Amino acid sequence: MTTVARLRALVVLLIVVFLVGFVLVQALEPDEPGSGGTVPVAGDTTTLPGDTAATTAPGDTSATTTPGGNLPPLQEVTLELVFDGLRQPLALTAPAGDDRLFVVQRVGVIRILDENREMVDPAFLDLTDRVLAGGIEQGLLGLAFHPDYANNGRFFVYYTDKEGRRQLSEFQVTTTDPNRADPGSERVIIEREQPPEASDIRHYGGNLVFGPDGNLWVSIGDGADSRNQGQDPNTIFGTISRIDVDGDDPYGIPADNPFVDGGGAPEVWAYGLRNPWRFALDPTEGNIYIADVGHAHQEEINVVSMLEGGYNFGWSDMEGTRCFHQPDCDPADYTQPVVTYLHNDQWTEGEPHPPGLSITGGYVYRGSEIPEIQGTYFYADWVEEWIWGFKFVDGQLTEHEDWTDRLGGTVGQVNSFGIDGHGELYLLTHGGQVYKFSAVR
């Protein structure tokens, strides 16, 4: 080979080496900070985190695409028993991202189930020295962790005290043990006697939920004083109320509460409720789901925008869709429920929904383990022990159906539903069991 030919070959070899090296560097070089990888453009079919490119309904055998890859086909959704032996559990929750479960027992004790679903001893908080749990609707009723719990250790409980008063209080976790709260750290936020004409043991409400606005939402029953409470927005009884626990002592009033400038108690966000035992906020769609326990005829679920307020749900002028204390009422004057079902003695064959006597409101499923049921709201009847669900999309009720058999049959009286720190759904039974909604694939 001539000298010129050798030089030409060397030049070609150097060019090839340079090009290969450039391609490898580009392939291995990370994206710019904050870029998050490839950003889809119009017409791109890339799945973003949080999106579900394809889902299957129960019974469908096609695969489900999630950010982590393809899930095997969903065979069924079941209720998986994760713990047994609690004393009348009424609420289950956890700080965001936490692997533990915090379970409220009516007697006045909060227990922790660790990541292996073993009970942690001693209890997280024991308030049996100050909680009255005599009547079936009394006791330690609600729990919510402050949105910044990881940094400030603050949480809130709702209970009936030894005098039968409603008590909303703040506590703090100890600085030395994340599994122990300080019972001496109590700061009373709201304390109310039962209304003058109320029952001593009934209609306390008691659900606590922090909204995406950082405010604490509270359900408060009418005390079984239906003629004096439900239609009076100047009292917090029979309402969903909303307060700012980071505001003035003992609490502040959100500037956009509907009665902040008058016309009702400033804490009140909505009224006309009997005993809203459980409600749920769904920030994804911007709705609040309120399950209100009925009196003589109907149980009901109200779904409205959580961005507004001032709703009057009708009690006690109305019960569900029927006039009650006001026989000539005009339903157009009140916000109407999206779901009602009749009590046993009102029900007749052919009704589209089974009868019941006491609704237990649940949550909209927004977890990641069962994307096929995303957006489904679940609820139960405490007496009849069935479980139903529906979706509420663009103001319309869809996929309203019986889930009892699909979940494996009845599990007993459902006291409450719960959400863990990762958005997965649970239910609690009067018999002391904790069940998780789980996928079989």
Model-predicted regions and their roles:
Residues 54-78, 178-183, 249-261, 324-335:
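Blade/loop signatures of beta-propeller domains
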Residues 20-45, 55, 61, 75:
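C-terminal region of N-terminal signal peptides and the immediate post-cleavage residues
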Residues 273, 397-421:
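Conserved blade-ending motifs and adjacent loop-strand segments that build the rim/top face
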Residues 17, 22, 58-59, 66-226, ...:
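Acidic, Gly/Ser/Thr-rich repeat motifs that build Ca2+-stabilized beta-propeller blades
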Residues 1-14:
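N-terminal Sec-pathway targeting helices
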Residues 104-107, 138-140, 148, 223-401, ...:
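Beta-propeller domain segments
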Residues 82, 124, 189, 269, ...:
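Hydrophobic residues at beta-strand termini and immediately following loops
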